[in-house]
Swiss-Prot record:
<dbReference type="GO" id="GO:0030527">
    <property type="term" value="F:structural constituent of chromatin"/>
</dbReference>
<dbReference type="InterPro" id="IPR000164">
    <property type="entry name" value="Histone_H3/CENP-A"/>
</dbReference>
<dbReference type="GO" id="GO:0030543">
    <property type="term" value="P:2-micrometer plasmid partitioning"/>
</dbReference>
<dbReference type="GO" id="GO:0005777">
    <property type="term" value="C:peroxisome"/>
</dbReference>
<protein>
    <recommendedName>
        <fullName>Histone H3-like centromeric protein hH3v</fullName>
    </recommendedName>
</protein>
<keyword id="KW-0137">Centromere</keyword>
<dbReference type="GO" id="GO:0046982">
    <property type="term" value="F:protein heterodimerization activity"/>
</dbReference>
<dbReference type="InterPro" id="IPR009072">
    <property type="entry name" value="Histone-fold"/>
</dbReference>
<keyword id="KW-0539">Nucleus</keyword>
<comment type="subunit">
    <text>Component of centromeric nucleosomes, where DNA is wrapped around a histone octamer core. The octamer contains two molecules each of H2A, H2B, hH3v/CENPA and H4 assembled in one hH3v-H4 heterotetramer and two H2A-H2B heterodimers. Interacts with the inner kinetochore.</text>
</comment>
<keyword id="KW-0238">DNA-binding</keyword>
<comment type="function">
    <text>Histone H3-like nucleosomal protein that is specifically found in centromeric nucleosomes. Replaces conventional H3 in the nucleosome core of centromeric chromatin that serves as an assembly site for the inner kinetochore. Required for recruitment and assembly of kinetochore proteins, mitotic progression and chromosome segregation. May serve as an epigenetic mark that propagates centromere identity through replication and cell division.</text>
</comment>
<dbReference type="GO" id="GO:0005634">
    <property type="term" value="C:nucleus"/>
</dbReference>
<dbReference type="Pfam" id="PF00125">
    <property type="entry name" value="Histone"/>
</dbReference>
<feature type="region of interest" description="H3-like">
    <location>
        <begin position="45"/>
        <end position="148"/>
    </location>
</feature>
<feature type="region of interest" description="Disordered">
    <location>
        <begin position="1"/>
        <end position="56"/>
    </location>
</feature>
<dbReference type="GO" id="GO:0043505">
    <property type="term" value="C:CENP-A containing nucleosome"/>
</dbReference>
Length: 155
């Protein structure tokens, strides 16, 4: 059937503002809209994001590195200052003590060996408590088990 002539056609009432604004197309999730690039010719090449390791990976890498080396871990000058400061408490004020570098080096080697062994025992205490994180109570237990002098257990 053909449309009737002279009839009134119905049209939707639309405001002028709504008709003027085009509807934006929705971007699918996971995609970003491309922006006009602000990079000009001759600019340096942008560096990519710095590599992010999983938690614990770098710690294991450091552990392997420290186990491989035999270097001293505490800086020499601060350790020497500490040794001199402690020694001053046992001497009269008018007497000055002189230290050979080999004597301070021997003290530092012994101190670091003591600390390494203490942390090994502390780690064993933490593992015994079914933990991987060492705590103050683990250090206290390790020192208590070692005894008064707390010497290296392997000597």
């Amino acid at each position: 059937m053909p449309p009737k002539k002279g009839g009134v056609t119905k049209s939707k009432a639309v405001s002028k503002k709504a008709a003027a604004v085009p509807t934006p197309k929705a971007t699918p999730p996971g995609r970003r809209k491309s922006r006009a690039s602000s990079v000009q010719p001759g600019d340096p090449v942008p560096q990519g994001k710095k590599r992010r390791y999983r938690p614990g990976t770098l710690a294991l890498k450091e552990i392997r590195n420290y186990q491989r080396t035999t270097d001293l871990l505490v800086a020499k000058l601060p350790f020497a200052r500490l040794v001199r400061e402690i020694a001053m408490q046992f001497r009269p004020m008018d007497e000055e003590m002189r230290w050979q570098s080999q004597a301070i080096l021997a003290l530092q080697e012994a101190a670091e060996a003591f600390l390494v062994h203490l942390f090994e025992d502390t780690n064993l205490c933490a593992i015994h408590a079914k933990r991987v994180t060492i705590m103050q109570k683990d250090i206290q237990l390790a020192r208590r088990i070692r005894g008064v002098w707390g010497g290296a257990g392997w000597v």
